Design a protein with these regions (language model features):
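Short helix-capping segments at alpha-helix termini
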Residues: 24, 201-208, 273-276
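Active-site-adjacent structural elements in enzyme catalytic cores
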Residues: 1-182, 333
Length: 335
């Protein structure tokens, strides 16, 4: 449906929007982002089940409610400290969402409780005469509001059923979550990451998850480097039977989230498989919100391998903490 959007930092514009919609001040707006990796700047946790929803329905008509790290602006944050985020698929919304220095807060272009507009002509006159700009993109392709899902409880709950129906959400969430670690040759860093993640996650067997690794320039069926095997053995992990695996379209398609070690890996995957751009993260980007790389220890000393393993383990612990949404929560619509 057609929407209204403002820069959430512009208090005058925000107040004008609320007045035009006759919208209660305690009802926040929805944050639009042009890509999912930007959510790290706004949320405390990205629960495991939300990864499946994000990979399946973003960009698209799904709004996800997260616990936020923000205290303000009031127009985006609920009294309970939650925020609604969506990555839209429409090119106009995508372009505006990607503008620098704008926090794009949105809502439907209607008076509160009234039907939403499917064309520019259906936008109420009292809204049309007050807004600064109307972008007429013709009739909306879907004509229905986004589905809203709260993932802040142990089991996600549907707050509003829209384009994406509850049965489809339920079916999606029944599938296991697939995590893929990627480096260059799949003989060092991604091997370490896969093994370390599995070890740390081992006590959470009630949640269906599959972890794999691959390399952007890997050859098939090569063993890890001797130093990789040694430093993993020092951690009680045996990776000697691991065989290197090239990155393939099938691996990318089945993954719900892809962690890369370097920006070149991220760009490589995005360029060859553009459909996957919303599920590719630098490992440190997801864990800590930093666009920093984990360098390749190949050709360096055994101690460099130990340093790399420690670095990866530190980030993996943060990842597990971030996706482990296990907490007390009431039975929900998807429960």
């Amino acid at each position: 449906v057609y929407g209204l959007g403002v820069d959430a930092k512009n208090e005058i514009a925000v107040q004008k929007l609320y007045n035009l919609k006759k919208r209660p001040r305690k009802k926040p707006l929805i944050l639009f982002l042009d890509k999912s990796t930007k959510i790290a700047k706004f949320v405390k946790k990205i629960p495991l089940h939300s990864l499946k929803l994000i990979s399946s329905f973003w960009p698209g008509p799904l709004t996800v409610i997260f616990e936020t790290i923000l205290k303000e602006p009031f127009s985006l944050v609920t009294e309970e400290g939650k925020i609604g985020i969506r990555v839209p698929s429409h090119p106009v919304a995508q372009q505006i969402s990607g503008e620098e220095d704008i926090i794009f807060a949105t809502t439907s272009a209607n008076i509160s409780t009234k039907p939403s507009a499917k064309t520019a002509e259906e936008i109420p006159f009292e809204i049309k005469r007050e807004v600064d700009l109307i972008i007429d993109s013709g009739k909306t392709p879907l004509g229905v509001e986004s589905t809203v899902v709260d993932v802040t409880t142990y089991l996600p709950s549907v707050l509003r059923e829209g384009v994406i129906k509850e049965d489809r959400l339920r079916k999606t969430l029944e599938d296991k979550v697939n995590i893929l670690f990627v480096c260059t040759a799949n003989m060092c860093r991604s091997v370490m990451a896969e093994a370390i993640f599995k070890k740390i996650w081992n006590d959470k067997k009630n949640q269906k998850i599959e972890v794999k690794s691959a390399g952007t320039s890997a050859l098939s069926s090569y063993s890890p480097t001797s130093y990789t095997i040694k430093v993993m053995k020092e951690r009680g992990l045996d990776v000697s039977s691991h065989l290197s695996r090239p990155l393939t379209k099938n691996l990318v398609e089945e993954a719900d989230i892809i962690f890369t070690m370097e920006k070149t890996h991220k760009y490589h995957i995005r360029n060859i498989y553009p459909f996957a751009q919303n599920k590719i993260w630098l490992l440190k980007e997801f864990s800590s919100g930093r666009e920093e790389e984990i360098q390749d220890p190949v050709g360096l000393s055994e101690e460099h391998y130990r340093k790399t393993a420690r670095e990866i383990e530190e980030e993996i612990k943060k990842v597990v903490e971030k996706i482990d949404g296990k907490q007390e929560g009431q039975k929900t619509l998807l429960g």
